């Protein structure tokens, strides 16, 4: 089973993925960006694409590895990744579903103001690459193809994770961490996922 968490940059995908991972056993957070970074490092600058999702190889690789993992891993794969192009969505998620694999897809929605505020907490201002993608992402992700939509403006990470688990009918382990431990865990996730563009 796959839980795909989509959303604009700053919507809380990665934090939600790791919150679910801590409370779903067994589970694994699968990061499609890693293949994108690998492609970016191996392609000559003169022919490199601005968005690694534009490489058919990126989409084919992630589809293939997710298909293989779904067939061999008995836990839940949690995939935090923004996909805005319907054709890319269909090449990966649509194809996995067509072949009978269970993919629960959720899009975390938030206002532009909320997204900018969240991006600032990770040192990305209004002129950052992520901030410049907000309008494109919010518009594209509002399409019905990207349902199930979850409005997150007034939800905590814990609320969003519990909402996703309920919609996917997955029981979560209780969160026995104190507030300090929860804060430290989320800070570590944030620090481990800072991307320098």
From Swiss-Prot:
Q: What is its main location?
A: membrane
Q: What keyword terms does UniProt attach to this protein?
A: Antibiotic resistance, ATP-binding, Cell membrane, Membrane, Nucleotide-binding
Cell membrane listed as a keyword: yes
Q: Name one Pfam family in it.
A: AAA_33
Q: Name one GO biological process term.
A: response to antibiotic
Matching entries from SUPFAM superfamilies are given as: P-loop containing nucleoside triphosphate hydrolases
Which residues make up the binding site for ATP? 7-14
An example GO CC term for this entry is: plasma membrane
Protein's membrane topology: Peripheral membrane protein
Organism domain of life: Bacteria
Where does the record place it?
Cell membrane
Q: Which GO terms describe its molecular function?
A: ATP binding
Role noted for this protein: Involved in the resistance to tunicamycin. Binds ATP.
Q: What is this protein called?
A: Tunicamycin resistance protein
Q: Which species does the entry assign this protein to?
A: Bacillus subtilis (strain 168)
| Taxonomic placement | Bacteria, Bacillati, Bacillota, Bacilli, Bacillales
Q: Which gene encodes it?
A: tmrB
